[in-house]
Amino acid sequence: MPLGAHLPTSKGFAAALLEAQSLELDCLQIFCKSPRQWAAKPLDLEMAAQFRKKWQESGFVPLVAHDSFLINLASPDDALRKKSIDAMIDEIERSEALGCDFLVTHCGAHLKSGEEAGLQKLAASLVECLEKTADLSVKVALEITAGQGTCLGAPFSHIGEVLKSVDSPRLSVCFDTCHAFAAGHDIISNLDGVIADFDAQIGLKNLGVMHLNDAKGVLGGHLDRHEHIGQGAIGPEAMRAILNHPKLKHLPFILETPDVETKIAQNVAAVRALQEA
């Protein structure tokens, strides 16, 4: 099981890779630019090429990026949706330049326009983004959400519908354990059932990335708050079952736990202790 973490890039992309190596991780997730700002200076392509070479030499697989929190590809506001599409295309291009295998994105929010309208907007936005980056290889991974507010992507049927509408080999899925639990998928007492439901509505073949996070909130509470591994509502035994499940254990597991600057080593150790040979 490849284990990775979302690590800060405030000191540069190469510094994040060095930290991943010091933690004895197998893979890595990063932001390609600030996730809380629309604008960003152009990516230094020479620096990106150097990082890409170092990454390839490291033997780590995969490299995952996460896009901006501001992007809403499902927005009913045409101006905001266009701004989001443009920003998403920029994220895809940055991810490709850095050598990323996946770019994780949230499904967006319908903002009271209705789920079906939101899903249609999301699918159309993704089609445009993928068509305009058709010469690139990075895959876009739709992330399961906690279902807070009008956010799409909590029911598996949402993502299944979008996958069918977009019908692209470059569209993948990211399963976040905290989000799934908060959305009401009982991964504690019915993990096999949740996986079977996911397979029926989305398809396990489309699952590219796992986000491994414990949860601060209760099952079905729609609270998107991550907790340290084994210290939240999901707990160590359910985490053990997820990590070692025969249908999941081959996937890259990315930690997005709190206090990454000071507690990431603690969470890596907790996961390693739960892994079975």
Language-model segments: what does each one mean?
Residues L18-E24, D44-V64, E91-G99, V127-D135, ...:
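Acidic (Asp/Glu)-rich catalytic clusters
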Residues A20, H66, S84, S95, ...:
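Conserved, mostly hydrophobic/aromatic
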Residues Q56-E57, L73-S172:
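Active-site acidic/histidine proton-transfer and metal-coordination neighborhood
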Residues E261-A277:
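C-terminal helical cap(s) of enzyme catalytic domains, especially alpha/beta-barrels
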